[in-house]
Amino acid sequence: MTTKQYGCVVPPIHLSSTYNFTGFNEPRAHDYSRRGNPTRDVVQRALAELEGGAGAVLTNTGMSAIHLVTTVFLKPGDLLVAPHDCYGGSYRLFDSLAKRGCYRVLFVDQGR
């Protein structure tokens, strides 16, 4: 099923969670929606085009985006500076990963 096949003006939202294989151990472009699906592909391409980027990555929550960025780009010894009153989930994530040696974190009072 493609947008061209049905003449959709707006890309459809694919709600399927699983996809069949073409044969034994021969997956198609998508096999399970948590790894990717046609809807995410369309949105990622659109975001990359809008931002002039080579690609884009979608995550299911803001916290997963923060976790992805900090674990991909920060290495042991790097310093993350964050506001002392940032979202509690972010604070706990930064603090927890810093205690494990993933990077260093400095919480600052931005009012000073």
For the regions a language model picked out, list residue spans one by one:
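Short conserved active-site loop signatures built around small residues
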Residues: M1-I13
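Residue-level signal for pocket-adjacent positions within structured domains
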Residues: V10, P27-H30, Y103
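Fold-independent oxyanion-binding glycine-rich loops
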Residues: S17-T18, T61-G62, P83-D85, D109-G111
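Conserved N-terminal alpha-helix of the aminotransferase class I/II PLP-enzyme fold
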Residues: T18-H67, T71, G89-S96
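Short, surface-exposed connector motifs at secondary-structure boundaries
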Residues: L50-G53, L74-L79, K99-G101
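Conserved PLP-anchoring active-site segment centered on the Schiff-base-forming lysine
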Residues: V72-S90, D109
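PLP-dependent aminotransferase-class I/II
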Residues: D95-R112
